[in-house]
Amino acid sequence: MTVTGNDGKKYTVDGSKSITLRPTWDELEQRVAKASNSLGSGNAASAQKLVELADIKLSWDIDEGFRQCPAFAGTDDGDNKALTKSETFGFYCPATPNVIYGNRSMPDWNMTYAPAAGVRHELSHHAIHMRCGTIEPEAIMQNGVNRTEGVTNSYAVKYMGANRALIQQSIDYAASTGHKQYRMDAFTDRAAERIHSGQCNAG
């Protein structure tokens, strides 16, 4: 085929040798946000397909995730208790950015929560990582308090198609067991908006 270059000249191109470019993160994010929660036979299978839509792999070896990112696993932060392994649905490790780790022993994988909220939260950690180069950019800090999980929930609801009611149920349950870091509010919503627009610094 013949194409015209920026210089106005005509060039002949062999179309049979063309390549398909990997979608941008914006394209992948929109693909996930628009996707149904019923992509496979059952909730766990649907959640896995949702992760794959983002060009990421779902691994059931959550211990490997903890080995790859020990600093992000099981660390209490002030009044916010860290989740134990038996409480952990999934895990995103920045050292292995193309993998979401799932804890298959959690019953939530068999519920609508898995595709509608759980994996969309984990994919939002990846989204923030892609946009800011870290899962904890300055934008998530509120008066010296790390709001990573709350901002990630807000991002999941605003940009990844997460079900707000199911996210809120998980927030309420987590808070009842001492894990208050997942709550959403006006700050986390604003921070998610800023991060989505590429503003990763403190606002």
Kindly give the residue locations of the regions a language model identified.
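A metal-dependent hydrolase signature that marks the N-terminal structural subdomain at the beginning
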Residues: M1-A82, Q199
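Solvent-exposed, acidic/flexible segments
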Residues: W25-L28, V32, K81, D108-A117, ...
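Second-shell loop/turn segments in exported
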Residues: K34-N37, S105-W109, E138-G144
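Surface-exposed patches in mature extracellular/periplasmic domains of secreted proteins
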Residues: A44-L53, L58-D61, I135-P137, N163-A175
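Active-site scaffold of zinc-dependent metalloenzymes
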Residues: C69-A114, H129-M130
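Short alpha-helical catalytic segment bearing the HExxH-like zincin motif
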Residues: A114-H126
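Catalytic Zn2+-binding segment of zinc metalloproteases
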Residues: L123-I140, R147, V151, K158-A162
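Long, well-structured alpha-helical subdomains associated
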Residues: V145, M160-G203
